[in-house]
Amino acid sequence: MQYPEPIAQLIDGYMKLPGIGQKSATRLAFFTIDMAEDDVTAFSKALIAAKRDLHFCSICGNITEGDPCSICADKTRDQTHVLVVEQPKDIMVMEKMKEYHGLYHVLHGVMSPIEGKGPEDLNIASLINRLQQNPNIKEVIIATNATPEGEATAMYLSRLIKPAGIKVTRLAHGLSVGSDIEYADEMTLFKAVEGRTEM
Amino acid sequence: MQYPEPIAQLIDGYMKLPGIGQKSATRLAFFTIDMAEDDVTAFSKALIAAKRDLHFCSICGNITEGDPCSICADKTRDQTHVLVVEQPKDIMVMEKMKEYHGLYHVLHGVMSPIEGKGPEDLNIASLINRLQQNPNIKEVIIATNATPEGEATAMYLSRLIKPAGIKVTRLAHGLSVGSDIEYADEMTLFKAVEGRTEM
């Protein structure tokens, strides 16, 4: 016996999401059938709306409804700093911190030889272009993830930007605040020692 | 900074699903934005369709597009056995086994004093009614889960149905096929010894 067509379709839909296999998708599909109709309708509309109404900011690559995005359009922000991140969601994380008031640039990925992703597949050309056209940008802070790909991308960007006389910095590596040295991995510990600061 | 409204709405939508919190929902929402438009549209429509086109079978309580469901409507199936399950998805599991050819009845839950769920909240009245109107039903196989609530519900049903002279059976408990005795819990092992069969 097959699942009724509407369930089978819904299971297929859920299975398109990352980390959701046949079993989870089936569970979610049956849960959906028990959900309030309003919630399902709202969810369904939100899916379409997110796809239809959101675009990438033509300046920084952030996800936005308008263009440019609210950060690029905000002239009260520090126009001398550009923080480079891998994904739009990283901007949200930085903004939650409330301590950075400069601009952003989203690469939409990192260089990854394994996935065949080179610099030309990333939002790098527009960053270089942006730096050339805005001489008031004094520092580029690279905030790619602390993965091998993130490090390689940071290194590549640094070599590309430094010759133009712009300061390039990288987020510090070290122990998480509140964490035990005992549980830190060797690489993090090494970075923490290497980057030790005077008290 | 807040997420753009369409993303916030989509995150809300995902958070309505079981086991998906703020972080997972955010990840899924951003993933959705990168999905192919066709896939998102299909998913969105499937949500609405599943809610709109599916109903419970008026006879057995299974989820179905038509009424009665394809199993109740299939007169070639063994009309003398009714297998009682907690949820519609349990029917799919049984059907995959391909060894049971009788009918089903879905309780839509189990008795649970903690959740304040009594017999009157389950699809039990219609089961009794069905047994009374179909004298050709000779055996009711109770296949609720092997949880305390499932056991209690099985016991309750057994006491309710037996006096009518209908045979009531329960799925066997025991070791999983291919499993090691070493890893079986005491309760399962006890049930396996208790239910031992002659060779």
From Swiss-Prot, chains A, B:
Residues 80-176 form the Toprim domain. Keywords: DNA damage, DNA recombination, DNA repair, Metal-binding, Zinc, Zinc-finger. PROSITE patterns: RECR, TOPRIM. One of its GO terms (molecular function) is zinc ion binding. It comes from the Bacteria. A zinc finger (C4-type) spans 57-72. GO terms for biological process: DNA recombination; DNA repair. Belongs to the RecR family. HAMAP family: RecR. May play a role in DNA repair. It seems to be involved in an RecBC-independent recombinational process of DNA repair. It may act with RecF and RecO. This is Recombination protein RecR. It comes from Levilactobacillus brevis (strain ATCC 367 / BCRC 12310 / CIP 105137 / JCM 1170 / LMG 11437 / NCIMB 947 / NCTC 947). The lineage of its organism: Bacteria, Bacillati, Bacillota, Bacilli, Lactobacillales.
